[in-house]
Regions:
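Short, acidic/polar
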Residues: 26-40, 114-126, 209-222
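Aromatic- and acidic-residue-enriched segments that line the glycan-binding/catalytic groove
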Residues: 1-12, 55-71, 121
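A structural motif
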Residues: 44-45, 130, 226
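Active-site-proximal loop/turn and secondary-structure-junction residues that shape catalytic pockets
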Residues: 51-55, 106-110, 139, 202-204, ...
């Protein structure tokens, strides 16, 4: 089920030495579903799916997808984005009976890019199948020069506000199109502005993020018309000062 090296058939690993499941493996899909159901059975209140994508770093010239290869390489109308869209639809169909929200983490630039970033993630392909979408709009993860900002870490408000404002526009446009073309689609009720719930940066990579920088991202989220967000720090040390007097400023 693993992604393989094209050169010798061994397990392919990224720069961190981590192996990857082939996103096109239906057996892997069933394995993920089984873990999700077991998580529900033991009492978790939400299922959040992360790393639901194709690899993005490592020796990409020596990579082979045993289950996705034919679809990814031989059919220009299929590709990585369609493989993942099919996976998202499968998750939804297999977990729709669970009385709990299902959410998905996407790269931050899925809110501003219309292509799949070569990892298979397209915002509109995920919207019909999850209760919440969490773009990881960490300012430090944007490339130098993004939207004209040479030092992205110096503009946490601007990066987050622009990214999430674009996502809000896209979800409204997507819902309008789908409502006119497939008015009876069951997923239309999922398509709402506050389906968007971004991950914001509260860590010190690659520079220390001050309370002001963290709060700027929170304010940027509210100003984009959203009312929920999450903070990320791998060390689980969060900036208390940034959270003082935080209220829901938008109830759309």
């Amino acid at each position: 089920k693993a992604v393989k090296r094209a050169s010798d058939g061994a397990v392919w690993r990224d720069r961190k030495g981590i192996g990857w499941l082939d996103a096109g493996s239906h057996e892997a899909w069933d394995y993920v579903v089984s873990i999700a159901r077991e998580s529900y059975n033991v009492g978790f209140e939400e299922l959040n799916f992360d790393y639901i994508r194709f690899p993005s770093d490592g020796n990409m010239r020596d990579i082979y997808y045993p289950f996705s290869e034919e679809k990814v390489l031989t059919d220009p109308d299929f590709g990585k984005a369609k493989v993942l869209k099919n996976f998202f639809a499968y998750l939804d169909s297999q977990l729709e009976d669970l009385d709990m929200p299902i959410s998905a983490d996407l790269f931050g630039m899925t809110t501003t890019n219309k292509d799949d970033l070569n990892i298979g993630q397209v915002l509109e392909n995920a919207l019909p199948y999850f209760d919440y979408i969490a773009p990881m709009v960490y300012p430090s993860h944007y490339p130098t020069g993004f939207n004209g900002y040479q030092n992205v870490n110096a503009y946490p408000y601007e990066i987050v506000n622009f990214s999430m404002s674009e996502a809000v526009k896209r979800i409204r446009e997507f819902k309008e199109i789908k409502a006119s073309t497939t008015p009876n689609a069951p997923y239309l009720s999922k398509l709402r502005t506050n389906q968007l719930r971004p991950w914001l940066q509260d860590n010190d990579y690659p520079v220390p993020y001050t309370p002001e920088m963290v709060r700027a991202q929170i304010d940027a989220t509210y100003d984009a018309g959203l009312n929920s967000w999450m903070l990320w720090d791998a060390a689980n040390t969060y900036t208390r000062a940034a959270l003082e007097n935080v209220t829901l400023e938008n109830q759309e």
